[in-house]
């Protein structure tokens, strides 16, 4: 296998050292081998998106995904420790705050349209706009419910793990 198509730059002459260079290098390896780029999926399952191209080793000409120091070890510790729950709670809370702000904005618009004095030309459009806004409020409310359910699930799993009668945590080395 030749290294002609692999990423190289001045900062990674002795091998890729930064996350950015490792990512570019891995993408170039995937492309050189004619493979589709496989993104790191482990943290996405935990509610945090990494997007780093997954590391692999070739075994009998076939790529086998593996963990490494740039991405895998970080995620390995992240998953084993349960620290991902905090990040997932933060992202779900941020999403919930955004949805609540959007819902308040929509309700204010509905109230303004319902109570406002409008010229006759605008009155023809008010019912359509109200219907559209009410449908959007319904969608936002549904998304909020999904987000709240996700928050409850994460908090429940954290509480089960912290319960005094829970089984001892066994950390296995990979």
Curated annotation (Swiss-Prot):
> What does the organism's lineage look like at the top?
Viruses, Riboviria, Orthornavirae, Kitrinoviricota, Alsuviricetes
* InterPro entries xref list: Cys-rich_furovirus, Viral_P18
Alphabetical keyword list: Coiled coil, Host-virus interaction, Inhibition of host innate immune response by virus, Suppressor of RNA silencing, Viral immunoevasion
Q: What does the protein in this record do?
A: Suppressor of RNA-mediated gene silencing, also known as post-transcriptional gene silencing (PTGS), a mechanism of plant viral defense that performs sequence-specific inhibition of viral mRNAs expression.
Q: Which GO terms describe its biological process?
A: symbiont-mediated suppression of host innate immune response
Belongs to which family?
Belongs to the virgaviridae suppressor of RNA silencing family.
Any Pfam family from its record, for instance, is: Viral_P18
Q: What is the species of this protein? A: Soil-borne wheat mosaic virus (strain United States/Nebraska/1981)
Q: Which residues form the signal peptide?
A: none
Coiled-coil segments:
86-116
Name the UniProt record assigns to this protein: Suppressor of RNA silencing
Q: Which residues cross the membrane?
A: none
